[in-house]
């Protein structure tokens, strides 16, 4: 089997395609969470602690000199990134928890009895007819 055909067999497997779709959706979800944290969560928190915008929090290690930009330790962006991570992790946890609950409900739900075959149906009818004949006086 050539290298190209092996790669093709690997790439078209369901798990690889599912993983690729998951990565793409995850990247888009990350952008949504970043916007949620930066635009919805952080402004009220900043307002509560005195109107501070977390993304602007930084410590200047060395001031700008001429064309050389300042050396800044931007810990506000780090705090915002941590909140992004916590919210994404919590959302994933809740999703996995919901999926596990659905799997447990499926496992607990009784399955319908199998449909009897034509032979079983015929034998049941014969049995019922024989019982009916025995019960006649």
Swiss-Prot record:
Pfam family, one: MscL
Protein localization: Cell inner membrane
SUPFAM superfamilies tied to this protein: Gated mechanosensitive channel
Segments crossing the lipid bilayer: 9-29, 79-99
InterPro entries: Mechanosensitive_channel_CS (IPR019823), MS_channel (IPR001185), MSC/AndL (IPR037673), MscL_channel (IPR036019)
Keyword tags: Cell inner membrane, Cell membrane, Ion channel, Ion transport, Membrane, Transmembrane, Transmembrane helix, Transport
Protein topology in the membrane: Multi-pass membrane protein
Molecular function per GO: mechanosensitive monoatomic ion channel activity
Gene Ontology annotations for the cellular component aspect, listed alphabetically: plasma membrane
PANTHER family per UniProt: LARGE-CONDUCTANCE MECHANOSENSITIVE CHANNEL, MECHANOSENSITIVE CHANNEL MSCL
Family: Belongs to the MscL family.
Subunit note: Homopentamer.
Function: Channel that opens in response to stretch forces in the membrane lipid bilayer. May participate in the regulation of osmotic pressure changes within the cell.
Protein name, as recorded: Large-conductance mechanosensitive channel
